[in-house]
Amino acid sequence: NVRACIELSVRGTPRNREEMQRQLMKLSSDLSMDFSFQLDNMYRRMRRLICFDMDSTLIETEVIDELAIRAGVGDQVKAITERAMRGEIDFNESFKERVALLKGLDVSVMEDIAHNLPITEGVERLMYVLKKYGYKIAILSGGFTYFGNYLKDKFGLDYVYANELEIEDGKLTGRHVGEIVDGKRKAELLKLIAQVEKVDIAQTI
């Protein structure tokens, strides 16, 4: 199972940049590859802040699915996720509905899942290299702070912003605490961290 990264430098001005990107993204999906489009300027070689998603990125699972299975509501949570994927409900509504189904789950289950998270191949080495070169590293996730903080401690990361599950008497209440971290909130948090670290937004990944 070989993984590789290839950099292609293209000169000139595309006749239709958006169409070129669409075609490459289709190829990305067909071949299970990732593409990143970057302007070849001074900032490209001077990145200082890198932000990661967590579920199915740093870890090879969706934590809410793992929690749902342990709570005996796996099928119900999956059905809500599918409704959201079809656009029938938005992320925030689907998030609240799924979290509500976790009510009563013992916090010890979260601890067990955290200590057995399947870390994506190469992540440990990547974090070591990024820290060695002085990058600030953040997790911005629609997942849960409990697991984000576990990874923060494990790899020595700088920031974690995710959703906090409310816990009372050692059990989940089926509610969350604070603002939901969705796509819009992630963009706001990226800008916030960049300001705190005095990093130009062009120097972020």
PLM ranges: what are they?
Residues 1-52:
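Non-catalytic pre-domain segments flanking phosphatase-related domains
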Residues 22, 104-205:
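C-terminal cap/substrate-recognition subdomain and adjoining C-terminal extension
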Residues 88-109, 113:
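Cysteine/selenocysteine-centered motifs that mediate thiol-based redox chemistry or coordinate metal-sulfur cofactors
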Residues 14, 18, 58-61, 74, ...:
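Electropositive phosphate-/nucleotide-binding environments in soluble metabolic enzymes
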Residues 25, 65-69, 128:
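A broadly conserved amphipathic alpha-helix scaffold signal in soluble, globular proteins
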Residues 42-92, 96-97:
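Active-site neighborhood of HAD-like aspartate-dependent phosphohydrolases
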